[in-house]
């Protein structure tokens, strides 16, 4: 699986450069994403702009990844999801379980807001 990672002060922006995200790619996705939870910068914005097709197992795996990130007090936001991928996730009843932003910029905003929420939550 081909992807590009850009790291900023608060998050990793990862763009998957494949037309299909399927179950047989989830191990590679884990190998890329799970080690990031051990770094100082843990938050991830996953850009799915190039993904044209996703199968149910891959969609379910994204939900599990997101859950793993939130359990570790880290953000996991999908962005730039194509309409056909959105429809596939919705048909599998997964769309509402995922944190999705229309653009990468809006995903960054979500990460920043969640960081503020975590900081405020820690202060009480």
Where are these regions (language model features)?
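General small-molecule cofactor/ligand-binding pocket signal
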Residues: 6, 79, 101
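STAS-typified acidic loop motif
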Residues: 2-31
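Short charge-dense sequence patches
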Residues: 7-18, 36-39, 55-64, 114-116
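Amphipathic alpha-helical interaction surfaces in cytosolic regulatory modules
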Residues: 23-98
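Non-catalytic signal-transmission and effector/linker regions of two-component phosphorelay proteins
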Residues: 1-7, 119-124
């Amino acid at each position: 699986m081909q992807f590009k990672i850009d790291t900023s002060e608060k998050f990793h922006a990862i763009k998957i450069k494949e037309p299909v995200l399927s179950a047989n790619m989830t191990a590679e996705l884990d190998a890329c994403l799970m080690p990031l939870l051990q770094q100082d910068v843990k938050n991830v914005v996953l850009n799915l702009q190039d993904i044209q097709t996703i199968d149910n197992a891959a969609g379910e795996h994204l939900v599990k990844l997101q859950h793993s990130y939130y359990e570790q007090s880290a953000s996991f936001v999908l962005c730039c999801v194509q309409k056909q991928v959105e429809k596939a996730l919705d048909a599998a009843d997964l769309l509402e379980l995922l944190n999705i932003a229309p653009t990468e910029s809006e995903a960054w905003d979500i990460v920043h807001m969640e960081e503020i929420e975590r900081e405020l939550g820690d202060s009480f």
